[in-house]
């Protein structure tokens, strides 16, 4: 193997740049030519390629986002689109592809291998942390720290005004961010897609906390469970006073990655190149315990990842 490519796809996650840097520098150290694909699968179809040298990735580890840029490509979801991408790969003599992204991106990588035998290795990067068979995805730790910092600031003003704040965080199908953020900030309630919410019980809990002298309430809701406005309507009707809503939105995706995310991304980037050199393809690099392992992409994607129900109960007891 002499020439490989790397792309970032789907929603950006802090640490993607660190993974790109590792792929490029480790690849170059092993005598490989490394090609960067701009704009994810859209760039793969269009042939938007750039050769990346050692110096091109200097100083990017600490940067959020992705220097390669990213996109969500509808064309790549078609067989015709993937055929165009495969033709570009073969035309440019690329012998292996590292795909950094979430569920959709990894599915695309698998299809490239299944349909066109393009050697691919996936690196899980998504702040939702909803990919199976890996304990952690790139970007999760940074996102959690961003949410934690925001909630702590909201608690200051919530206490000053004796108010209840409803904080909506990302997580369409997974409540991981909401659960962990709620646990570490001592939120009074955590609403996640995996567990049905009883608004009457929630209101009773908030009112009971008020009777015990607590002057603020923080409710963290994952976007996939309910909108913050829906939660507010249900609660205000039952508790009899106004709430305040904060939707953190895309601020959760940005920012300089934490030390934990940088280390994970750099390690996964190195392991991805090793997997290609070893001829072990159609695999995803996963963190299990404290060890990086290679698992089949579709096995990871077909393994449903759920939140820790015991941790959810602990968060409730400690709030």
Curated annotation (Swiss-Prot):
GO cellular component terms attached to this protein's record: 6-phosphofructokinase complex
Transmembrane spans: none
Binding residue positions for substrate: 126-128, 163, 170-172, 223, 244, 250-253
Pathway assignment: Carbohydrate degradation; glycolysis; D-glyceraldehyde 3-phosphate and glycerone phosphate from D-glucose: step 3/4
Regulation: Allosterically activated by ADP and other diphosphonucleosides, and allosterically inhibited by phosphoenolpyruvate.
PROSITE patterns: PHOSPHOFRUCTOKINASE
EC assignment: 2.7.1.11
Enzyme class, broadest EC rank: transferase
SUPFAM superfamilies: Phosphofructokinase (SSF53784)
InterPro entries linked to this entry: ATP_PFK (IPR022953), ATP_PFK_prok-type (IPR012003), PFKA_ATP_prok (IPR012828), Phosphofructokinase_CS (IPR015912), Phosphofructokinase_dom (IPR000023), PKF_sf (IPR035966)
Gene Ontology BP annotations: canonical glycolysis; fructose 1,6-bisphosphate metabolic process; fructose 6-phosphate metabolic process
Amino-acid positions noted as binding ATP in the UniProt annotation, renumbered to this chain: 11, 72-73, 102-105
Highest rank taxon of the organism: Bacteria
Keywords for this protein: Allosteric enzyme, ATP-binding, Cytoplasm, Glycolysis, Kinase, Magnesium, Metal-binding, Nucleotide-binding, Transferase
Primary subcellular site in the record, as a coarse category: cytoplasm
Positions bound to ADP: 21-25, 155, 186-188, 212, 214-216
Compartments (UniProt record): Cytoplasm
Active site, UniProt feature: 128 (proton acceptor)
Reactions catalysed: beta-D-fructose 6-phosphate + ATP = beta-D-fructose 1,6-bisphosphate + ADP + H(+)
Cofactor requirements of the protein: Mg(2+)
Family named by the database record: Belongs to the phosphofructokinase type A (PFKA) family. ATP-dependent PFK group I subfamily. Prokaryotic clade 'B1' sub-subfamily.
HAMAP family: Phosphofructokinase_I_B1 (MF_00339)
Oligomeric and partner information: Homotetramer.
Protein name per its UniProtKB record: ATP-dependent 6-phosphofructokinase
Gene: pfkA
């Amino acid at each position: 193997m002499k020439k490989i490519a790397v792309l970032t796809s789907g929603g950006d996650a802090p640490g993607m740049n660190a993974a790109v840097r590792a792929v490029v520098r480790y690849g170059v150290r092993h005598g490989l030519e490394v090609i960067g694909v701009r704009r994810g699968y859209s760039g793969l179809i269009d042939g938007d390629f750039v050769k990346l040298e050692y110096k091109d990735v200097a100083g990017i580890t600490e940067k959020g986002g992705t220097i390669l840029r990213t996109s969500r490509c509808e064309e790549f979801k078609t067989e015709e689109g993937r055929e165009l991408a495969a033709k570009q790969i073969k035309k440019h003599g690329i012998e292996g592809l590292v795909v950094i992204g979430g569920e959709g991106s990894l599915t695309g990588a698998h299809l490239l291998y299944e349909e066109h035998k393009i050697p691919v290795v996936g690196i899980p990067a998504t702040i939702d942390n909803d990919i199976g068979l890996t304990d952690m995805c790139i970007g999760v730790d940074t996102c959690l720290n961003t949410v934690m910092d925001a909630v702590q600031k909201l608690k200051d003003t919530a206490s000053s005004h004796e108010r209840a704040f409803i904080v909506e965080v990302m997580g369409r199908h997974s409540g991981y961010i909401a659960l962990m953020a709620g646990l570490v900030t001592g939120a009074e309630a955590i609403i996640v897609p995996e567990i049905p919410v009883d608004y009457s019980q929630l209101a009773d809990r908030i009112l009971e906390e008020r009777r015990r002298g607590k002057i603020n309430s923080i409710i963290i809701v994952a976007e996939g469970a309910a909108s913050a406005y829906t939660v507010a309507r249900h609660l205000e009707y039952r508790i009899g006073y106004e709430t305040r809503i904060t939707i953190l939105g895309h601020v959760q995706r940005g920012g300089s990655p934490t030390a934990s995310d940088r280390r994970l991304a750099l390690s996964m980037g190195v392991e991805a190149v090793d997997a290609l050199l070893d001829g072990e393809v159609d695999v995803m690099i996963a963190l299990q315990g404290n060890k990086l392992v290679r698992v089949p992409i579709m096995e990871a994607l077909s393994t449903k990842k759920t939140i820790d129900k015991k941790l959810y109960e602990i968060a409730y007891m400690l709030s």
